[in-house]
Amino acid sequence: MLDLYEHTDKYSSKNYSPLKLALAKGRGAKVWDIEDNCYIDCISGFSVVNQGHCHPKIIKALQEQSQRITMVSRALYSDNLGKWEEKICKLANKENVLPMNTGTEAVETAIKMARKWGADIKNIDESSSEIIAMNGNFHGRTLGSLSLSSQDSYKKGFGPLLNNIHYADFGDIEQLKKLINNQTTAIILEPIQGEGGVNIPPTHFIQEVRQLCNEYNVLLIADEIQVGLGRTGKMFAMEWENTEPDIYLLGKSLGGGLYPISAVLANQDVMSVLTPGTHGSTFGGNPLACAVSMAALDVLNEEHLVQNALDLGDRLLKHLQQIESELIVEVRGRGLFIGIELNVAAQDYCEQMINKGVLCKETQGNIIRIAPPLVIDKDEIDEVIRVITEVLEK
């Protein structure tokens, strides 16, 4: 009889190469494997479970809604959609929202919206509309999102991709000034790059991008799919620079770890370019998704998880920056979104931490990304600090 790993690998596609660790249960900031070993989860499904694993309030919302109605086509109204729309729009200070399912769908929607806005509002010819993205970004792996990537290894073999995409170094406003022109319809960026290595831009960079967009009448798209909803100690990472984008992209923890839901938020002057037939989603905004998402947003507020991320994130960052290790190049982060950059490959050290009960994952080969659920408590944070210190100082 095949074991769990062989059984899974026999039928799985080969686009993932997971660690041989199979999880069977999760509660709060902790998970348990099939042998009942416990770990503090510092991956959080890449910020999907900001509210913690299996939060009872979110589960209750899912259970109750699933007994009423789960699916209503957007050809009709439902009793939940308007309530959810109002909640998320007020949170993001935007007038309109377009619900989708996954993060990459939100990015694809934003690309379409930006191009349509450029054609309708700026009168840019469809053949010459340009978008500027940042080097080191990650916006998804569907064709439109992939076209924004600056990493050739992600794109190789999948062409032809979207054209007229240009790249600037993240944090280099002078490069942006050279690239932007009257054919530019949008600049898209992550306020803090996640997959790229927990990269924090220089002070005022985001504000300068906003000013540049204003000068050229260009849309600023903030991809907060991973860093939004409290992860960095602010509800939105853009708040660190007191800057408003034209379009917010949200996903991941918007569904509380239970249901895929994403959102594209903008004011009416931008959103109105999408008219009936120009875009849609079979499952986007369904009653079950809305019920789950409303509960997920309530948990963020009622349990003060944004403040918890700020407070415990400061504690975590301070202690990690005090580790004395020749391996460490830099420890950087905001809130509970921290990167430990090493001068060697990070995978072995991640595996050592996992063996000691802290679940983590490397990115870009040499960076350990630490991003626990925002429900984590002080004792759990201190245990994370102890394990990381023990592994890296050794």
Swiss-Prot record:
Pfam families: Aminotran_3
Keyword Transferase found: yes
Biological process, per Gene Ontology: arginine metabolic process; L-proline biosynthetic process
Enzyme class: transferase
Gene Ontology MF annotations: identical protein binding; ornithine aminotransferase activity; pyridoxal phosphate binding
Catalytic activity: a 2-oxocarboxylate + L-ornithine = L-glutamate 5-semialdehyde + an L-alpha-amino acid
Modification N6-(pyridoxal phosphate)lysine occurs at: 252
Keyword Calcium (UniProt): no
GO cellular component, one term: cytoplasm
Similarity comment: family membership: Belongs to the class-III pyridoxal-phosphate-dependent aminotransferase family. OAT subfamily.
Name recorded for this polypeptide: Ornithine aminotransferase 1
